[in-house]
Amino acid sequence: MPSHFVSPTPTLPLPAGWRPVDLDARAVRALMTARAGGASQPPYDTCNLGDHVGDAPSAVAHNRRLLADHMQAVPIWLTQVHGNRVVRLSHTPDPSDPDVITPVAGGAPQPHADGSFTTEPGLACTVMVADCLPILL
């Protein structure tokens, strides 16, 4: 791993199968999760992050907190719809632009979009994939 790569949270051991993505970029961090390491019961065992598949909401909330703790960032989740909308994540609201998404205490409705980007530290562009290929630019 390059010496300038910063693991999401070096002080917390990653659950089995979770891997930091080795990027040659000073300001970009990435993490790929696996099914192990969470609180979900079968058939979602154990680290299900999807709140749309019928898993217990408390288990999904626990798993998402675990991920946020490891990332040391606020994950912004999308409702992915196989469309062409890309949203910008920001700490500062922009009421004139519906494609600017800000974190809200206690959670917020997940925007319907298939991509996100940010230039601000502390925000995580978060996507879930099953049979799709995630792209990080």
Segments from the language model and where they lie:
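Active-site microenvironment for binding and transforming phosphate-containing groups
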Residues: 1-137
